[in-house]
Curated annotation (Swiss-Prot):
Cellular component terms (Gene Ontology): COP9 signalosome; cytoplasm; nucleus
Record-given protein name: Cop9 signalosome complex subunit 11
GO aspect biological process, one term: protein deneddylation
Main localization, broad class: cytoplasm
SMART domains, sorted: PINT
PCI domain segment(s): 195-367
Protein role: Component of the COP9 signalosome (CSN) complex that acts as an regulator of the ubiquitin (Ubl) conjugation pathway by mediating the deneddylation of the cullin subunit of SCF-type E3 ubiquitin-protein ligase complexes The CSN complex is involved in the regulation of the mating pheromone response. PCI8 may also be involved in transcriptional and translational control.
Recorded name of the encoding gene: PCI8
Annotated keywords: Cytoplasm, Nucleus, Signalosome
Localisation: Cytoplasm; Nucleus
Length: 444
């Protein structure tokens, strides 16, 4: 359940399960009492989970807990962290914990293990910007180590084999934590791609995964493999599963995860009902119990896989029934209706829903756009024709009585009654209602 969690991570795992209301009442009570017992041992009760721990345990109010705190916590209770840093993590004062870690002077032989701990804290508080910086630094470190190996063999021989190996293992674990970061961000393609790139470039990757991942008391081997499994199933197109499962470079990894191979084979053979029994059964249980898997699983991963199969049926069918899909896939009818309707609307797919039936519409989205543009064009042309007619009528009026709109009314009347050919400029100005001082119409 807690994958051997120690230190602050134990409280995080217990608090997570209680927060999502997971488990039976007696289980939850037992977890809560275990959490409170740990808090008393490390002399720290300032955790955001304290209220729910007390509520689920049925123990005394929060204010009475501190009276039981005595002695100094044993280092084994701190999860490899300094006492003050462990308390900061328990209190969710993550930024202060990271600051303290970054401010410490660390022996050269422990620098990568130290960076490993900083990466763990950054993951707990989802400081993905900080993790990006760590990823950049790790790339430079790895490149520097390669150059060092090529140019400085004497120095390499001087350093003990154990130190070199510990550094290599720490760097690989940090890179695995980067995969965890991608998963938490729901970047499933990046998660599995990063891991498979590690496998091809770092021969020790699978050794560290199988033998040296659990030792950091953060994420278990089973949880990490499940992250990769889910990322593969979601990211790789349905049509490419058949090629993927036979990749020779991944043969060793497939041996570590028969569950993934089984799922791929079921999907390749379109045995979706059996696949979803595993997806909603064994895989769902593992994810819901995990601090690192549950958030992305509940937020997107579970439904993305279902939508992937819905889309497969839409692609090969012109007419579908919700009830048929429900019985074929073994998924609740109401869930299918809600998810498939959202898929059609958000994807602007050419399907129309009529009760229990989904029909394919022959007209494409492009054709709908063309039709709309054509209708708009007709309306615009009608407006233009109307304006043209109004302008023509106005022109006819002006041409029929051109002097009606010249100057003032009196001037127009006078000029209209007498021929302008018989007048000179002075005479016209004399007859105008507008004086010279006002700038007469015919002033020279």
């Amino acid at each position: 359940m807690f994958h051997g969690a120690k230190g602050p991570l134990l409280i995080e795992r217990i608090g997570h399960l209680l927060s999502i209301n997971y488990g039976e009442k007696e289980e939850r009570k037992r977890w809560a009492m275990q959490g409170i017992s740990y808090l008393q041992e490390v002399q720290c009760t300032s955790t955001p989970y304290l209220e729910i721990l007390v509520e689920e345990s049925g123990l005394r109010p929060v204010s009475l807990l501190n009276s039981q705190l005595v002695g100094k916590p044993h280092f084994s209770l701190l999860g490899g962290f300094d006492e003050n840093i462990a308390r900061d993590i328990i209190s969710h004062n993550f930024q202060n914990a990271i600051f303290q870690m970054e401010s410490e002077e660390v022996p050269l032989t422990k620098r990568y293990q130290h960076l490993e701990k900083i990466t763990q804290i950054s993951l707990l508080c989802k400081n993905f910007k900080g993790i990006e910086e760590i990823e950049y630094n790790v790339k430079n470190i790895i490149q520097g180590r390669k150059n060092f190996d090529m140019l400085n063999s004497m120095e390499k021989d001087r350093i003990s084999h154990e130190v070199v190996q510990d550094d290599s293992f720490s760097l690989l674990r940090i890179q695995m934590l980067l995969c965890v970061s991608y998963f938490l961000q729901e970047r499933y393609f990046d998660c599995c791609t990063k891991f498979f790139t590690m496998m091809t470039s770092e021969p020790l990757t699978l050794k560290v995964l199988s033998e040296h991942l659990d030792c950091m008391n953060f994420i278990s081997k089973e949880e990490f493999i499940m992250m990769v499994n889910i990322s593969v199933l979601i990211s790789i197109p349905l049509d490419n599963y058949d090629d993927f499962i036979y990749l020779s470079d991944l043969k060793q990894f497939f041996q570590m995860t028969p569950l993934l191979v089984n799922c791929l084979e079921l999907l390749i053979n379109t045995n979706f009902n059996k696949f979803f029994k595993i997806w909603h059964g064994e895989i769902n249980k593992i994810c819901m119990e995990s601090l690192f898997l549950e958030p992305s699983w509940s937020s997107s991963a579970a439904v993305i896989m279902r939508c992937k199969i819905y889309f497969f049926y839409l692609r090969i069918s012109k007419k579908l029934q919700f009830s048929y899909l429900s019985s074929t896939l073994g998924i609740d009818l109401e869930d299918i209706k809600e998810e498939l309707t959202k898929l059609i609307i958000s994807g602007q797919l050419n399907f129309e829903i009529d009760g229990d039936v989904i029909h394919f519409e022959d007209s494409s989205i492009l054709q709908s756009i063309v039709n709309e543009i054509s209708r708009n064009g007709t309306m615009i042309n009608e407006v233009i024709d109307k304006l043209k007619n109004e302008n023509t009528d106005l022109k006819d009026i002006i041409q029929g009585n051109p002097l009606m709109y010249s100057g003032g009314n009196n001037t127009a009347t006078i000029i209209n009654n007498e021929s302008s050919d018989d007048m000179d400029i002075d005479e016209v100005n004399d007859r105008s209602d507008i004086s010279d001082s006002e700038g007469g119409l015919f002033e020279c």
